[in-house]
Curated annotation (Swiss-Prot):
Enzyme class: hydrolase
The organism of origin for this protein: Carica papaya (Papaya)
Note: Substitution of the conserved Gly residue by Glu-155 could possibly explain the unusual specificity.
Protein name: Papaya proteinase 4
Any one GO biological process: proteolysis
Signal keyword on record: yes
Length: 348
């Protein structure tokens, strides 16, 4: 057994050293691999090397690289098997493909505070009537959405979701699209917990009470530090309050999205969500929500309704950083719990 393992390691090292000579063999299709890549260990290693270059991955030694390669193979096997089973959406390689699902959850998902559904707000949006709604809404097309960001190794999804909604309503009300500071919320919203979870509502309340600086003036560093809001100069964007959308109701959420981007929560810990590449997602998730994102539109494709979601895992995940989640009619938590807890900023 030791001889076989040593030989495998030598083969791995050899191909890693010389694999760059044949990277052209790797076909990065829409899912990041081709069926030919699954035919031999050599092809898999070449694919892994190509993937490493694409995502700027570096490992401290050969042992770590071999360990990550084994996880990469397992994820690739899962992706390929699931793509043969599911319809309507598909999985693919992304920057998380060298992480086990447990590692992915630890680094990027975490959980929401237990009392996340019981937070203060100034008004509740209740409108179940979907008859007069626009057939589709996409706030990106209206210039109210900034580029997709990456939260890094910091459970600050709540801050990214809040900032995206404030950026959106500020554009709608003033005509100006500016990038705002997630780091200010991580540092200064004392009702939340920095890189260890937080609240949509209290961060929106912070913006209403204090305003929020531009991202360029208070840049993101993916770790909590002492609040510097009083030392940062330049303009601030301010809102007037916090609104909550009626829970577990499709109509109310669609109506709210038709007016502005909305902060929502989803369950994102599953392997399908980790490896999502495109299509209308409707599979393998429950409603135990653990991740805040931003609803920036809705629509239909192929007869299926969806909510358009902006995530904070960078543009390499999903559909250039977005996911379309299947709509569920009536009173329910929705697919992945997307109807469970939704908030938005009020700006006069």
């Amino acid at each position: 057994m030791a001889i076989i393992c040593s030989f495998s390691k030598l083969l791995f090292v050899a191909i890693c050293l010389f694999g760059h000579m044949s990277l052209s063999y790797c076909d990065f299709s829409i899912v990041g691999y081709s069926q030919d890549d699954l035919t031999s260990t050599e092809r898999l290693i070449q694919l892994f090397n190509s993937w490493m270059l694409k995502h700027n991955k570096n490992y401290k030694n050969v042992d770590e690289k071999l360990y990550r390669f084994e996880i990469f193979k397992d994820n690739l096997k899962y992706i390929d098997e699931r793509n043969k089973m599911i319809n309507g959406y598909w999985l693919g390689l992304n920057e998380f493909s060298d992480l086990s699902n447990d590692e992915f959850k630890e680094k990027y998902v975490g959980s929401l505070p237990e009392d996340y559904t019981n937070q203060p707000y100034d008004e509740e949006f209740v409108n179940e009537d979907i008859v007069d709604l626009p057939e589709s809404v996409d706030w990106r097309a209206k210039g109210a959405v900034t580029p997709v960001k990456h939260q890094g190794y910091c459970e600050s999804c709540w801050a990214f979701s809040t900032v995206a909604t404030v950026e959106g309503i500020n554009k709608i009300k003033t005509g100006n699209l500016v990038e705002l500071s997630e780091q200010e919320l991580v540092d200064c919203d004392k009702q939340s917990y920095g890189c260890n979870r937080g609240y949509q509502s209290t961060s929106l309340q912070y913006v209403a009470q204090n305003g929020i600086h531009l991202r360029a003036k208070y840049p993101y560093i993916a770790k909590q530090q002492t609040c510097r809001a009083n030392q940062v100069g330049g303009p601030k964007v301010k809102t007037n309050g916090v609104g909550r959308v009626q829970s577990n109701n499709e109509g109310s959420l669609l109506n709210a999205i038709a007016h502005q981007p909305v902060s929502v929560v989803v369950e994102s810990a599953g392997r399908d969500f980790q490896n999502y590449k495109g299509g209308i997602f409707e599979g393998s998730c429950g409603t135990k929500v653990d991740h805040a994102v931003t609803a920036v539109g809705y629509g239909k494709s192929g007869g299926k309704g969806y909510i358009l979601i902006k995530n904070s895992w960078g543009p390499g995940w999903g559909e250039n950083g977005y996911i379309r989640i299947r709509r569920a009619s009536g009173n329910s938590p929705g697919v992945c719990g997307v109807y469970r807890s939704s908030y938005y900023p009020i700006k006069n």
